[in-house]
Amino acid sequence: MNTPIKFTTAEEAVKVIKSGDHVHLSSVASAPQCLIKAMCARGEAGELKNVHVHHLHTEGPAPYADPKFEGVFQLDSLFVGANVRKVTQSGYADYIPIFLSETQKLYRSGAVPCNVAMIQVCPPDKHGYVSLGTSVDATLAAIECADHVIAVVNKYVPRAFGQAMIPLSKIDLFVQDDQPLVEAKFSEPSDVEKAIGAHCAELIEDGATLQMGIGAIPNAVLAQLGNHKNLGIHTEMFADGVLPLVRKGVINGEAKKTEPGKMVSTFLMGSQEVYNFIDDNPGVLMMDVGYTNDPYVISQNDRFVAINSAIQVDLTGQVCADSIGTKFWSGVGGQVDFVYGASLSKGGKAIIAMPSITTKGVSKIAPVLDTGAGVVTTRNHIHWLVTENGAVDLYGKTLQERARLVISIAHPSAQEELDRAAFERFGSHHHYIKGYMQK
């Protein structure tokens, strides 16, 4: 069935947006830039007021968040990316704290209205279906709930399978705009990050199912897994680092209980190579975030290993991953979804991995979290903590035992101060690292 599409211009399409509307934008590389530009032009012309914009992490410009649009556009993001970090910290934009698994529920429950969904899709196939490509996440829920769905048809959007495939009947307005997707570039792992990767890799067994983010530490972990067997991927996102392991047959999904033989994700960031990899690839399923990040679904896979990072960890194992003090840096994301899911998995491991010290020489392990810092993963949820100095398992450990273990993998320059803080907090009847506290 060849379904004809009647295209309109971006300028005409965004006329469905009214003052006071809530507008969802598809995520990461799929942010529909031509529609964003046209929407902002209406704002510049004084045609819109109090339009709420929602999205997860996006790559590329975010002009609607410019302070000059105060009173015109209000960004209430579901994750704070680099392109909106400063305006969020200054108060011109805002953030909705929420587990990634529940972002779709905001729309489906009506807690956040969705009047207009602006998305990108690949050209339709002969059956009248298009693909959301790199962004299913909460975008699928937005499409289901929106009064108007505007789709940019872009030949560069990969034809991904799973719940990314939607019928043309779900879309109200079509705009043609063939633009290469934004590519995310990642630096080579440092020696510290390579050491962290090696410690994490030692915790991964053959037949494990993996979740990890993107960036230097995940890439360092993946680089250490070349001799593993029968690994699987069930994650919220992946990037180029998995591709060598897929080609080598290390990642084949054969041991997975859910979608055996398939890689499962909800959004993607990376180079054109990873976009090409998911194009027309039945071995990759792009699914709704309510599925990928459901702790119960995650837990069905034995030996599930979740690797996430942190900004700061205290002596009891509280993990801050969304803010630096009172300043939001990112968001809750899916960390807790996967930490909890992995902890419920038979033989699973939930890992928080980070350098022991910042590039400015500040210890990331602290006696207490900074004032205003958000607790993302609680001390009740944390299991493994990894730095370049080693890996410690905090599960089932007392507060004093945790303090000793956490200090043992802190940066040497910080251990004496942490020793002293532990002594002052927990009393004098236990010694910690350097004999500051002697029984």
Task: For the regions a language model picked out, list residue spans one by one.
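Conserved alpha/beta enzyme-core scaffold
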Residues: 1-439
